[in-house]
């Protein structure tokens, strides 16, 4: 049984529930299957089999529906952190000097990262009986982990729609730490921060925007959503990736390789620098200008059913340039040739 058939069978088996609660349950198990496949590296069939028999699943849904204990789990205060809660919004303040690594894991939750004061790291997020987010600070590692939605909490999903989840992170302009932030199905944005360690930002099925930022190395990824990057600098490699969407990159400076990848989406760029530059897409145009003269680059390029301004590039310069697409044009110019 595949996922579509399984979810339809579950929908039919829960016919006694109101339509909104029935769909909440179906959506919950759809996400649970995706999580199992991602976390355990298993197939769709294996993830479905691990859920148990259909009658057991239906019974667990009905048991969760009758549960009335809505107490928010008690959490112990974290040493070195000042925590405040108001109207379900939790604010955690930490001395920046105590942090060397920041890890954030959200779910279906937008993340915004911005520049604040010079001495503190501030986290704000929504936490209630339907959303459990665990905060910890140990040996210089700050962790904020949003737990998977429980079966019990799915019947509070009406509140989830009225009170939107979010995570905001405010850090010093010069953050003496590495930063790794991930979410899913939600927008991510970062502006005006210099990260002394590596920077990794990831989401899915939504856009991601990073501006005026620097780091030791950068890996910025989404899927099925636009990626916008401007004013980025890294002493190491920079990788920008999305799929089925447009990728825009301007004023990007990598001390090592610079990679731009998407599919079924246009790549628009200007002022890119790296020891090697790769730009790959499909079914869309690659369009922009590079610094220096044409003889600064050694070019590999390919397209189909489209024009290619790099087709007759014969120079053997110090910087490898690899540009590929399909069913569309490659239009690359060089500023020193203008």
Language model regions located:
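Amphipathic, heptad-repeat alpha-helical segments
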Residues: 2-21
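Amphipathic alpha-helical segments within well-ordered protein domains
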Residues: 11-15, 34, 44-48
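Residue-level detector of well-ordered alpha-helical segments, enriched
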Residues: 21-28, 57
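Amphipathic alpha-helical segments that form the core helices of the histone-fold
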Residues: 26-38
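Short, charged early-sequence alpha-helical segments and their helix-coil boundaries
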Residues: 37-77
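Short linear S-[DN]-x-LW-Φ motif typified by the pepsin-like aspartic protease active-site region
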Residues: 74-145, 164-182, 187-200, 207, ...
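Short, surface-exposed interaction patches in beta-rich subdomains
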Residues: 147, 211-212, 218-221, 227-338
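Acidic/polar low-complexity surface segments
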Residues: 154-158, 298
